């Protein structure tokens, strides 16, 4: 954000709305390239043009765009575009990378003003992402129903452009965005989130996709506040849009004028909402009547206000006592633990059946084995196989790699209620390591283990750093120590360390 302020020197009151001239500045592409090297490589593969990035190509691109008589595209010949010539794909992607930086400038300037002491909108429910873990432990077991709605797609390209026009008031920039989208997608009018990320700049498309989903979520949060009379998380700069304020005002009038008598049907003081992996997840403590009303609300909102076709079958309602929610790499559900209490009054005794709701988090072992199979640690049945691509490394490096993966998975899934599934994962990694070493030394697994013994694999069984700290706090024979090892332990860094969680 400081780099934007130094390079751009924009007047926040006027000039930040006119972003089109920035596409002709070389430092924009330099900033985008530096950002990609530092951050985006964590999540996305190289698209094939990163090694071709140079200042010479940027200058050539700017010169081509600056020639006004060549800014007419031919729809009949998308591969030989007069603007970009034979380097159509390369130049289109470079423009997308630069434009992704440009459209974020208004938000970056607002964040800079906040960091310099400007007043930030207050919220009584502004929480960190790490509040997920207390929510799972303290509140999840009290919920009854969960609603999972697949966010409808394909999304028309024009809808993405229209969603951005209320943030960027520069018409030239919007025309450039529209031109780039249609040009790079080969004039195909529809895209899906997964397809767009694979063929277009990930940073730009994630920005456009999140801005689009934020539109209907803002209206949902408004109605949710009106129905439950609870404050929700402030969205800050993402709610500064005149068009959708008009929609919210209209919906508010309809809500109060037409449905005031039935307001009690929507009241739910215990409702939670989150968007995760292309799904809108709504959980509630109330009855099935209320959750079904929210189901048809989602369908109608997408169809009549955002022109996205959605069917009620894409919205599923499940009871948490009979269904496991796939969230953050865990299968979370509410388990009923039956218990019998004997009560005696004078000479009469009674047996009282009592069921206690508890949180049950399980490891999706089938999906995890599928991820290990894709990574070539085992076959589809879970049988360990060797890793031939690592066979050229030293023995110590091979063992360190396998041990690191095993510890990361154990660290991530330490919040599981039953850790027996982790033993199978460790078994797969341990014997995959042995088979890789045996393949390197051109020996069988049995002969290799007989020759060196199993001591060299004891690192798979040594305690982690966190377990060592816990053992220092509680003695090994202490009762609380045994309870800690059997119970769930949530580590705050698991949000970003495990790449195998995204099984899809």
UniProtKB/Swiss-Prot annotation:
InterPro entries: Domain_X (IPR024937), Maturase_MatK (IPR002866), Maturase_MatK_N (IPR024942). Transmembrane segments: none annotated. The keyword Transmembrane helix does not apply. The keyword Chloroplast applies. GO terms for cellular component: chloroplast. One of its GO terms (biological process) is mRNA processing. It is found in: Plastid, Chloroplast. Its main location: plastid. GO terms for molecular function: RNA binding. It comes from the Eukaryota. Disulfide bonds: none annotated. Keywords: Chloroplast, mRNA processing, Plastid, RNA-binding, tRNA processing. Belongs to the intron maturase 2 family. MatK subfamily. Usually encoded in the trnK tRNA gene intron. Probably assists in splicing its own and other chloroplast group II introns. This is Maturase K.
């Amino acid at each position: 954000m400081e780099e934007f302020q130094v390079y751009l020197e924009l007047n926040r009151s006027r000039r930040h709305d006119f972003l089109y001239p920035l596409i002709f500045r070389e430092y924009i592409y330099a900033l985008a390239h530096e950002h990609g090297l530092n951050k985006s490589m964590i999540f996305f593969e190289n698209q094939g043009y990163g090694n071709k990035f140079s200042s010479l190509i940027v200058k050539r691109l700017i010169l081509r765009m600056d020639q006004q008589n060549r800014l007419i595209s031919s729809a009949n010949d998308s591969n030989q575009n007069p603007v970009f010539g034979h380097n159509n794909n390369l130049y289109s992607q470079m423009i997308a990378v630069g434009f992704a930086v440009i459209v974020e400038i208004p938000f970056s300037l607002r964040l800079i003003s906040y960091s310099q002491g400007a007043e930030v909108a207050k919220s009584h429910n502004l929480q960190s992402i790490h509040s997920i873990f207390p929510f799972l432990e303290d509140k999840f077991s009290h919920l009854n129903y969960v609603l999972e709605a697949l966010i409808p797609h394909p999304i028309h390209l024009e809808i993405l452009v229209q969603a951005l026009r209320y943030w960027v008031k520069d018409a030239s920039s919007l025309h450039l965005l529209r031109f780039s989208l249609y040009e790079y997608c080969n004039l195909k009018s529809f895209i899906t989130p997964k397809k767009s990320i694979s063929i277009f700049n990930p940073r730009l498309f994630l920005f456009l996709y999140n801005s689009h989903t934020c539109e209907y979520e803002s209206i949902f949060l408004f109605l949710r506040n009106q129905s439950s009379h609870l404050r929700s998380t402030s969205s800050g700069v993402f709610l500064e849009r005149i068009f959708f304020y008009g929609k919210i005002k209209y919906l508010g009038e309809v809500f109060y004028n037409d449905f005031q008598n039935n307001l009690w049907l929507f009241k739910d003081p215990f409702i939670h909402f989150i968007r995760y992996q292309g799904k809108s997840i709504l959980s509630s403590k109330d009855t099935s009547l209320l959750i079904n009303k929210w189901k048809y609300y989602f369908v109608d909102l997408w169809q009549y206000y955002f022109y996205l076709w959605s069917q009620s079958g894409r919205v599923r309602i499940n009871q948490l006592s009979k269904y496991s929610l796939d969230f953050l790499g865990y299968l979370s559900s509410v388990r009923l633990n039956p218990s019998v209490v004997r009560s005696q009054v004078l000479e009469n005794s009674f047996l009282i059946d009592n069921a206690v709701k508890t949180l049950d988090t399980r490891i999706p072992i089938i999906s995890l084995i599928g991820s290990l199979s894709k990574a070539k640690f085992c076959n589809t049945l879970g049988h360990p196989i060797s890793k031939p691509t690592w066979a050229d490394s030293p023995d110590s490096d091979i063992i360190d790699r396998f041990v690191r993966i095993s510890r990361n998975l154990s660290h991530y899934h330490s919040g599981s209620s039953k850790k027996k599934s982790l033993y199978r994962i460790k078994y797969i990694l341990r014997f995959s390591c042995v088979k890789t070493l045996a393949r390197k030394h051109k020996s069988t697994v049995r002969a290799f283990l007989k020759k060196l013994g199993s001591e060299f694999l004891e690192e798979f069984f040594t305690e982690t750093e966190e377990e060592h700290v816990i053992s220092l706090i509680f003695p090994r024979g202490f009762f609380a120590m045994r309870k800690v090892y059997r119970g769930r332990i949530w580590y705050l860094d698991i949000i970003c360390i495990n790449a195998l969680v995204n099984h899809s």
